[in-house]
Amino acid sequence: MDVSKVVSFSRNFAVLVKVEGPDPKGLKMRKHAFHQYHSGNATLSASGILLPRDIFLSGEVAAKVLFEAGQDMALVLTVASVVEPFLTLGHRTSSSISQDPVKLIPGAMIEIMVEGQLKSEKEAPFWVPAQLLSLVDVPVSSAALQSLIEASSGSKDSGWDIGWSLVSAANGSQPSINIEHYSKPLMQLDEPHNANFMAKSATRMAILGVPLSLLGQPSMNFASSSSKGDTLVALGSPFGILSPVNFFNSVSTGSIANSYPSGSLKKSLMIADVRCLPGMEGAPVFAKNGHLIGILIRPLRQKNSGVEIQLVVPWGAITTACSHLLLEEPSVEGKASQWGSEVLSVKSDASIPAQVAIEKAMESVCLITVNDGVWASGIILNEHGLILTNAHLLEPWRYGKGGVYGEGFKPYVLGAEEFSSTGSKFWEQKSQTLPRKAPRNHYSSVGENIREYKHNFLQTGHRDIRVRLCHLDSWTWCPANVVYICKEQLDIALLQLEYVPGKLQPITANFSSPPLGTTAHVVGHGLFGPRCGLSPSICSGVVAKVVHAKRRLNTQSISQEVAEFPAMLETTAAVHPGGSGGAVLNSSGHMIGLVTSNARHGAGTVIPHLNFSIPCAVLAPIFKFAEDMQNTTILQTLDQPSEELSSIWALMPSLSPKTEQSLPNLPKLLKDGNNKQTKGSQFAKFIAETQDMFVKPTKLSRDVIPSKL
């Protein structure tokens, strides 16, 4: 289904939630990325979704709640974080939801902005008063988020927090009415920062009541299941109260990157590969067929890098948490809810075969740990357990600060100082060890018959290398040995499993140069390591740039004719630490590149959407060797130095020859190296020949236009 149709339909449900109340000390806006503040009143905003009362609430509970509210109502679901600062003290300081009715402080009020088409006499969006009915915890989503946060508790620098990176937790500075300006530091109140509190706070929802007569009754379907890579559409209002006309119901599209728990049809939490901004928390997230997937919440933010991971609470988890309020079981996918007249027609999705191919290719991506200290990703090349990964995982000292390929190369990218080595620190919990699962089958390892290829860079010290495979719907840990590490410009290495449990799923490669602008999926274990219990994540983008080399590698398997071949891929898909060694896939699920690195700004900020991969055309000898793993000379040819490849991967391509240009009437100096004149005599001759030029200025031609700096 066309995304524009999904957007048009979903605008019936997306709303902007505004909460205003007295704040004489300027404390309500803390932990919020933006606000308005006038005459002692603070205003916050978030996004929300409009829902029908008769579907969401049971008759008995609805009568009680709506009787207390005083009128018949429709419902709005939003995040609790937008209303919690304005709750009475007892509800604001409690870590759990009180049984007593929730109340706002005196003078606080809630309004929602809805699309104009929901009221026939108004064409423009308009504000509707709302009342706070209830707060709801989502236990399964909270537990999932807590487990992700606690997985990094052993590493102080790589820990996680909840909230937007625009929020300054250190001094409390917040952007005010103008997005470009920040208010003065605010006094901070002590809050618990344990994982349980953060997870509960992030996943808590608020149910609002709005007059039903103002809103009409649109119709909606609810998605019963979603898979990684599925397209999603989010409608939210970033910085909504700062300019509702400009920001109301903005559209952001992306895909599902991962979900928790892995391998389960009932999702507790989803990780979204989508660009979002503050104020979009509470936004409804729809599938490509128009079914509601869930609600966007505040992101998970990495403390040391500021990287934001967008999170979605699935609709199924919300309905489970609200089971005491539900009138009936949520409608299954493909079945319309029994309210309203407009139903979005659902047609078969032609992209399903491609999605199946991508899901199959994801089984070829594994997780690699070295000495329980770092982890990265790897790619299964054949059924005998040959794994392709990056050399910097095994020999990081070769790719450290000060030059990736030697002292002469310093990779600067838009002022960048160095590549970000995408191997990531493992959680520093020495007492915990990774389990090794006994294999169901023992295949004789072909690696035993391989003559290990050694060179100066291959270290023979003890290293505990383990690979986590995802096969037969289970995870299996296997020890592995180093087979090959490239000693030249290519950041590649090969590992061999000591034993092969069951049947593996090798990757399928595409050796052609991918067209610019075509879809690129990056699959790997970025950010979330072995203790997080997540399968590989998938982030989508496009092929932004293909850097070609004019000379082929000097190999026996590749033609030695002078011709262009792809030497580097750049994509807009997000690449995070731990994702190196992952696969870049095209829309058919075929591998087109090996992820090596992303970019880092000179100030230290990582740029995940500027990343670099080795094209499969360069990796052709690796795939040739993987066929029978006998001809090790194929690997030796990769160690031949290539000045052109080195310059490309150092981000220092050879410069074009300089054209000799001279100023008008400027005599050409003698440049013959055999000229025996001293510097003084040459300078004297220069002054004599140019004496007239210094008497009066030469009028420049009109063709020469001065350039403004």
Curated annotation (Swiss-Prot):
GO molecular function list: endopeptidase activity; serine-type endopeptidase activity
GO biological process assignments: protein processing
Pfam family, one: Trypsin_2
Enzyme class: hydrolase
InterPro entries tied to this protein: Peptidase_S1_PA, Peptidase_S1_PA_chymotrypsin, TYSND1/DEG15
Active site: 392 (charge relay system), 491 (charge relay system), 580 (charge relay system)
Keywords: Hydrolase, Peroxisome, Protease, Serine protease
Gene null: resulting phenotype: No visible phenotype, but loss of processing of glyoxysomal precursor proteins. Increased resistance to the herbicide precursor 4-(2,4-dichlorophenoxy) butyric acid (2,4-DB) and to the inhibitory effects of indole-3-butyric acid (IBA) on root elongation.
One GO term describing the cellular component: peroxisome
Mechanisms controlling activity: Inhibited by N-methylmaleimide (NEM), but not by E64, benzamidine, aprotinin, leupeptin, pefabloc, pepstatin A, EGTA, EDTA and 1,10-phenanthroline.
EC assignment: 3.4.21.-
Chief subcellular location: other
Compartment(s): Peroxisome
Effect of residue 276 to A: Slightly increased proteolytic activity
UniProt key word Protease: yes
Protein family: Belongs to the peptidase S1B family.
Subunit-structure text: Monomer and homodimer. Multimerization requires calcium ions.
Function: Trypsin-like serine endopeptidase involved in the processing of glyoxysomal higher molecular weight precursor. The dimeric form carries out the specific cleavages needed to remove PTS2-containing presequences, whereas the monomeric form degrades the removed presequences and misfolded proteins. Not required for degradation of glyoxylate cycle enzymes during seedling development.
PANTHER family documented for this protein: PEROXISOMAL LEADER PEPTIDE-PROCESSING PROTEASE, SERINE PROTEASE-RELATED
Protein's name according to its UniProt entry: Glyoxysomal processing protease, glyoxysomal
Organism, as annotated: Arabidopsis thaliana (Mouse-ear cress)
Lineage of origin: Eukaryota, Viridiplantae, Streptophyta, Embryophyta, Tracheophyta
